[in-house]
A protein has these predicted regions:
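Hydrophobic transmembrane alpha-helices and immediately adjacent juxtamembrane helices
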Residues: 2-299
Length: 299
């Protein structure tokens, strides 16, 4: 038997099934469903409800990236290893950069792995909407899943690189101290800052395609704006306050300090990085969800 619900009944029905939605009856049978709180407006509950879809997209992206290649998943390790050999040859032997007591190959491989994670997360997240325009125009799902997929794919690559990093630490006899307890916080901060930057660029690149043209150049320059291939001791002391205003510099140096026992970043720079992280992530989510309704038409 078919039952036709009146607007009042439908409102009551929907109100009980969606804790993150508010039902507003505007009269004449028109019912508007809106998020009932700020978290709902950011789209986070919808992403959690569709976490199985996020897992599917992540696995599909990883397979699609590496399976068609000859080396397959070996590229996850070979790419940072190849760059590491180049920088060790240039900075270690030609320039003579010293990172004592940390062996230079371990120093560079950790820095390159972190840089590739940062660069990959920002670039992939920024271009995720444009690259997935086809499926987004045909099927509805929480759009935030698209940039989150880019984040988690790069997280998986970074975790694979850390297997090599741990191996190098064992080979060279480098062991972390008590400050390793801060490692997850610095690494999580790096991931969230990278995602926030990519999310902001993704929201604005739909209307401003010049962003995607300039982004590869900016990412190549950023490797020298962070302590990835050179020690922090090479930065002139009078420029250190300006240098640490870059949140990526303090986060990467914090990872080096917590894992390898290098010089700790100033705590004021860590605090400023945390503030910028919160502001950037919130703004990125707001900008993304604000344009979510119209982004498909603009792609």
């Amino acid at each position: 038997m078919n039952t036709k619900l009146h607007p009042e009944d439908r409102a009551g029905h929907f109100r009980s099934t969606s804790p993150c939605s508010a039902i507003i009856d505007e009269g004449e049978g028109v019912i508007v469903i809106k998020p009932s709180n700020k978290i709902g407006r950011l789209g986070l509950p919808q992403v959690w409800e569709s976490k199985h879809l996020l897992k599917y997209f992540v696995l599909r992206s990883i397979r699609g990236r590496y399976r068609p290649t000859t080396m397959g998943y070996g590229w996850i390790i070979f790419r940072p290893l190849l760059l590491c050999l180049v920088y060790v040859g240039v900075f270690g032997y030609m320039v003579g950069v010293k990172t004592d007591p940390i062996p230079f190959p371990l120093f560079v491989f950790l820095g390159i792995s972190l840089y590739l994670f940062f660069s990959g997360t920002v670039s992939d997240t920024a271009s995720s909407l444009i690259n997935n325009a086809g499926i987004m125009s045909k099927v509805y799902y929480p759009r935030l899943i698209v940039p989150l997929t880019s984040l988690f794919v790069n997280v998986m690559d970074l975790l694979a690189s850390f297997v090599v990093i741990i191996g190098l630490m064992l080979i060279y006899g480098v062991y972390p101290g008590w400050n390793v307890v801060y490692f997850p916080f610095f690494l999580g901060g790096l991931a969230l800052v990278s995602f926030a930057m990519g999310l902001i660029l993704a929201a604005h690149s739909i209307e401003r395609r010049d962003i995607m043209m300039a982004l590869p150049v900016v990412m190549r320059v950023m490797v020298y704006a962070m302590p990835c291939v050179y020690p922090i001791s090479m930065v002139p002391e009078k420029l250190l306050p300006l240098y640490y205003m870059n949140p990526m510099a303090s986060l990467i140096q914090g990872i080096r300090w917590s894992l390898l026992g290098e010089v700790a970043p100033p705590w004021w720079s860590v605090g400023s990085a945390a503030v910028l992280l919160i502001i950037g992530l919130y703004y990125g989510l707001i900008a993304f969800t604000r344009d979510e309704r119209t982004m498909v038409d603009s792609l």
